[in-house]
Curated annotation (Swiss-Prot):
It comes from Lactobacillus johnsonii (strain CNCM I-12250 / La1 / NCC 533). One of its GO terms (cellular component) is cytoplasm. This is NH(3)-dependent NAD(+) synthetase. The lineage of its organism: Bacteria, Bacillati, Bacillota, Bacilli, Lactobacillales. Its EC number is 6.3.1.5. SUPFAM superfamilies: Adenine nucleotide alpha hydrolases-like. Deamido-NAD(+) binds at R141, K174, D181, H261, K262. Transmembrane segments: none annotated. CDD domains: NAD_synthase. It catalyses: deamido-NAD(+) + NH4(+) + ATP = AMP + diphosphate + NAD(+) + H(+). Mg(2+) binds at D53, E166. Catalyzes the ATP-dependent amidation of deamido-NAD to form NAD. Uses ammonia as a nitrogen source.
Amino acid sequence: MRPLQEKIVAYEHVLPEIDPKKEIRKSIDFLKDYLKENPFLKTYVLGISGGQDSTLTGKLCQMAIEEMREETGNKSYQFIAVRLPYGVQADASDAADAIAFQKPDQDLIVNIKEPVDAMVKVVEATGQKITDFNKGNIKARQRMVVQYAIAGANNGAVVGTDHAAENFSGFYTKYGDGAADITPLFRLDKRQGKAMLKELGCPKHLYEKAPTADLEEDRPDLPDEVALGVTYKDVDDYLEGKDVSEEAAEQIEKLWKKSEHKRHLPVTIFDDFYKQN
């Protein structure tokens, strides 16, 4: 392996091969253990987009919650799935299919268009210009505000969908979809998550669809792979310790270095990670 590749693989804890059944059980047990160690928590809250990551995470949450109810006899354990469209969601049918697959205890829909537009309006009233890219980040952060509000009303924790193939590049909004209390997919790459969904009997179109962030109005269907400048196949191969082309490796390592700040808490005077790049 390349020197930096070895460091990244170790940080992300990606295995070269997985047993999907074992990883499903590992994630469920992790979610249950967090609740057991924090008995004041009774709810998991997750935003559902209809993509692979939230579909898998939501299914694991519901399975963990059902086991907690069965094992403890406590019916207050709940999984709340939240759909968070900005106006009309183009792939709303996929989000509905994900909900049908997960069978959450509660399925909520909160449209974030009004608060996002209000935020843009009051900021631009000061003379600032909010770009479409910036507005996309506002959407992501507003979605997390909603999830934490719901969690706060239900003795809950917010679940994140971050995984190795996303974490290495910081391909999420800082304090937006990158904010959460617990991330059960951390250690998995994209193909491994897909294998777990197959094992769980997920409808094929939910894990075969091209991943998109769907934050920018100017480029609503921009594929992740285009935004990243590298394919998920190359990313997965790299994270599993395999050889990839020099071009792909350099792009992956460039993304890793550029996004280092996203993998840390706010910088303090005692930190020096930002000086290493």
